[in-house]
Amino acid sequence: MFLKSELLECNGSSVTLFQLSALQRIEHLEYLKQLEAVEVGDFQAAITFTVKSGAYLVAMSLWHGHPLKGSQGENAAAEVAKIQDEVMQTWPTELVAEAEYKVKLLSGMIAPVIDEPTSSGEERNEPAEPVTAEKPSPVS
C-alpha cells in the first residue's frame, strides 16, 4: 500500500489513521459541497456541519484498515457511512477533531506547524538594532 499511516491513541485504545487516497480527496470535496448550505448565523447547523465533516474525513481514513472494508461489495461509500456513524456515536468531539487534523496532515491537506526557536529580539517583534534613515556617524 502506498498510503502513509499514523497511530492515534486515546484512553488506552488505538486506531490506525491512513492518508486519504486521491479518489477520497475528491469525494471529501464533494461531501463538503453538499453540506455547504449552512445559513449565516445558524450556529447549531455550523457545529453539526463541523462534526459531520470531521467524522466523514476520519471515517474515510479508517476505512483502509477497518473490518467493514469490502463487506458491501463495490459500495465503499456505504461502508464509509457506517464507519462515520460509528465515529460520531462513540468518539468524543475532541478526538474527532484531533484525528481529522492528523488525517489532513498525513494527506497533505494542511502544512505541518514548525516550531522554530526565536531569538529574544524576534520574540517581541522588535528589531535587534534601532533603524533610522540617518547615516551612521563616526565614533569620536
Curated annotation (Swiss-Prot):
One of its GO terms (biological process) is viral tail assembly. Residues 114-140 are annotated as: Disordered. Disulfide bonds: none annotated. One of its GO terms (cellular component) is host cell cytoplasm. It is found in: Host cytoplasm. The keyword Transcription does not apply. Keywords: Host cytoplasm, Late protein, Viral release from host cell, Viral tail assembly. Its main location: host cell. InterPro entries: Tail_assembly_G, Tail_assembly_GT. The keyword Amino-acid biosynthesis does not apply. Promotes tail assembly by creating a scaffold for the tail tube proteins. Tail assembly proteins G and GT probably wrap the linear tape measure protein to create a tail assembly scaffold. This allows the polymerization of the tail tube protein, during which G and GT are released, therefore they are absent in the mature virion. The tail assembly protein GT is produced by a rare -1 ribosomal frameshift. The ratio of translated G/GT is about 20, and this ratio is important for proper tail assembly. Interacts with the tail assembly protein GT and the tape measure protein. Belongs to the lambda-like tail assembly protein family. NCBIfam families: phage_lambda_G (TIGR01674). This is Tail assembly protein G.
